[in-house]
Amino acid sequence: MAQIQFSRGVSEPVVPEVRLTRAKSGNSGTATFRFESPTILDAESTDDITGMYLVDEEGEIVTREVKGKFINGKPTSVEAILIMNSQDEWDRFMRFMERYAQENGLGFSKA
């Protein structure tokens, strides 16, 4: 099962908007995840955000580039950036996203 976590072992049920960019050479790329009102920011949540973990049967992809957005002093969203520096990292990310998309009803559209 493909899951996104902000704290190890705690799945985030909010499905993000994901934007992809890729170098013309194909050797590097960036995925930007935007979560509106994720449950990790709920007042009842006591878990710390330690990164973003993309977990599936192949293992785990990790980024520490996670930022919160605050409006009037209250957390409203989380943005995470995953940088891929090789074709292998890109391919691994795409395999994760295919699984995650199937499980969460996501589609893909080219900009």
UniProtKB/Swiss-Prot annotation:
InterPro entries given in the database record: Psb28_c1_sf, PSII_Psb28_class-1
Primary localization: membrane
Membrane topology reported for the UniProt record: Peripheral membrane protein
Compartmental location: Cellular thylakoid membrane
Quaternary structure and interacting proteins, as annotated: Part of the photosystem II complex.
Similarity comment: Belongs to the Psb28 family.
Cysteine disulfide partners in this protein: none
CC terms in the record's Gene Ontology section: photosystem II oxygen evolving complex; plasma membrane-derived thylakoid membrane
Biological process, per Gene Ontology: photosynthesis
Keywords assigned by UniProt, alphabetized: Membrane, Photosynthesis, Photosystem II, Thylakoid
Any Pfam family the entry gives: Psb28
Protein name: Photosystem II reaction center Psb28 protein
